[in-house]
């Protein structure tokens, strides 16, 4: 099962400034897009669908909407 990736405006702005945005999107699709509860992600504040993971050198805070198969990235922090 594959999840659609969506980026909220703050995360989308950060993504637009990343050097290798296309590779980052591809890695997001490969990892969190196929298993949003995997890839060593952790629940934030005991909310199962509010998660954090490190993907392709960036910290990603996202929500999982299982009913519509969507992962929404709300914050994206590229590591130096």
For every predicted segment, state its role.
Residues 1-59, 63-80:
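Basic, Lys/Arg-enriched alpha-helical interface segments
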